[in-house]
UniProtKB/Swiss-Prot annotation:
Mg(2+) binds at E256. Keywords: Aminoacyl-tRNA synthetase, ATP-binding, Cytoplasm, Ligase, Magnesium, Metal-binding, Nucleotide-binding, Protein biosynthesis. It comes from Bacillus mycoides (strain KBAB4) (Bacillus weihenstephanensis). GO terms for cellular component: cytoplasm. Tetramer of two alpha and two beta subunits. This is Phenylalanine--tRNA ligase alpha subunit. Its EC number is 6.1.1.20. Belongs to the class-II aminoacyl-tRNA synthetase family. Phe-tRNA synthetase alpha subunit type 1 subfamily. GO terms for biological process: phenylalanyl-tRNA aminoacylation. The keyword Disulfide bond does not apply.
Length: 344
C-alpha cells in the first residue's frame, strides 16, 4: 500500500505539471481526490490494516493528499495569473475618451423651502417639533378651542379613521401636545413642520395632502408687536429686504385676535398686477395671539402667560418664491420640473 501511494503521488504531480488549462487540473483533482479516486479508495481500505500499521499509513495518506492539493492550488493560481496577463497584453483601454457625466440629484423644492424656513426660525431661537400624522380628535380640535359642536369644524373637512382618530388637518396638534407635555409650564418657542390632510379636491391651488409649518411662542408679556416683528423678519429673509407686510383682521378659533398676513407683490412691487389681482398684496399665512382657552386647557395660567401662533403652507411659499403656478407640479415627479431646482 505504501508503494502504491508513492506511485499515485508521483503520477498525480506529473499530470499537474503537464496540464496547460484549468480544465485539465480539474480533471486531475476529480481523478485522484474525488469520491471515486484512488486516494479515497485507500482510505476505505484502512480498516483492513493492523492497529500498528494504521497510524503510519494514515499519516502517509494525508501527506500524499495534501501534497497533491497544494500543487493543484499552486498550478491553478499560476494558470489564472497567466490568463489575466494574456488579457492585459491584448486588451487596452483608451484613456483619452471623455468620461460619462454622472447625473446628480437635487433637493425637492418643498424640502428646500422647508429647510430654509426652519433655518430662519432656528436663527431666531426656535426649536423644531414634530408629531404624528395620525392624530386624536382631541389634540386636533378640542385642545385648540374646537369642541365637537363648534361650527368652525366645518372649515376643515377631515379624513376620519375612527370616531376619535383622524389624519391631522394642521400641525397645531403638535403645539397642543407640546404645551401639555411642558410640565413646568414655562416658555415655549417652536416651529412644527409636517404633512397635513384635508378633504379638498385637487386643483391648481388645492391638494388633499400638503406641507404645513406652524409656529408657537409662549412666554410672559408676549404682545401682538412680537408676532408682527417675527413675521417681518421671516418675510425679509425668505422673499427679500424690500418686501413689506400687512396684517388684516380674521378669525381662527385657537387665536384671539386673529390676523391674516399679506406681503407686497414681488411681481409688481405693490403697484397691482394679475398675480396679486390688482391689489398689490398676496396672502401667505394666518396668525394671532393664542386664545386663553387653549392656554388653560394645556395647564397654563392665561393671566400670567401669553403667546402667539402662525401657520403657513410650504407649497404656498414655494409657489411664490419660485413662480410655480400649479401646486400639483410638486407631486407629479416630473424630472423636467424638478431639475430646475438644482443648486449650483
Amino acid at each position: 500500500m505504501e508503494a502504491r501511494l508513492k506511485e499515485l503521488k508521483q503520477k498525480a504531480l506529473e499530470l499537474i505539471e503537464e496540464a496547460k488549462e484549468l480544465k485539465g487540473l480539474n480533471d486531475v483533482r476529480v481523478a485522484y481526490l474525488g469520491k471515486k479516486g484512488p486516494i479515497t479508495e485507500v482510505l476505505r481500505g484502512m480498516g483492513k490494516l493492523s492497529a500498528e500499521e494504521r497510524p503510519r499509513m494514515g499519516a502517509l495518506v494525508n501527506e500524499v493528499r495534501e501534497a497533491i492539493q497544494t500543487r493543484l492550488e499552486d498550478k491553478i493560481g499560476n494558470l489564472e495569473k497567466a490568463v489575466i496577463e494574456a488579457k492585459l497584453a491584448t486588451e487596452t483601454i483608451d484613456v483619452t475618451l471623455p468620461g460619462r457625466p454622472v447625473e446628480t440629484g437635487c433637493h425637492h423644492p418643498l424640502t428646500a423651502v422647508v429647510e430654509q424656513i426652519e433655518d430662519v426660525f432656528i436663527g431666531m431661537g426656535y426649536e423644531v417639533a414634530e408629531g404624528t400624522e395620525v392624530e386624536k380628535d382631541y389634540y386636533n380640535f378640542e385642545a385648540l378651542n374646537l369642541p365637537k359642536d363648534h361650527p368652525a369644524r366645518d372649515m376643515q373637512d377631515t379624513f376620519y379613521i375612527t370616531e376619535e382618530t383622524l389624519l391631522r388637518t394642521h400641525t397645531s396638534s403638535v403645539q397642543a401636545r407640546t404645551m401639555e407635555k411642558n410640565k413646568e409650564k414655562g416658555p415655549i418657542k417652536i416651529i412644527c413642520p409636517g404633512k397635513v390632510y384635508r378633504r379638498d379636491d385637487d386643483d391648481a391651488t388645492h391638494s388633499h395632502q400638503f406641507m404645513q409649518i406652524e409656529g408657537l411662542v409662549i412666554d410672559k408679556n408676549i404682545r401682538m408687536s412680537d408676532l408682527k416683528g417675527t413675521l417681518q423678519v421671516f418675510v425679509k429673509k425668505m422673499f427679500g429686504e424690500d418686501r413689506e407686510i400687512r396684517l388684516r383682521p380674521s378669525f381662527f378659533p385657537f387665536t384671539e385676535p386673529s390676523v391674516e398676513m399679506d406681503i407686497s407683490c414681488m411681481m409688481c412691487h405693490g403697484k397691482g398686477c394679475g398675480t396679486c389681482k390688482g391689489t398689490g398684496w398676496i396672502e401667505i399665512l394666518g396668525a394671532g395671539m393664542v386664545h386663553p382657552n387653549v392656554l388653560e386647557m394645556a395647564g397654563y395660567d392665561s393671566k400670567e402667560y401669553q403667546g402667539f401662533a402662525f401657520g403657513m403652507g410650504a407649497e404656498r411659499i414655494a409657489m411664490l418664491k419660485y413662480g410655480v403656478d400649479d401646486i400639483r407640479h410638486f407631486y407629479t415627479n416630473d424630472v423636467r420640473f424638478l431639475q430646475q431646482f438644482k443648486r449650483a
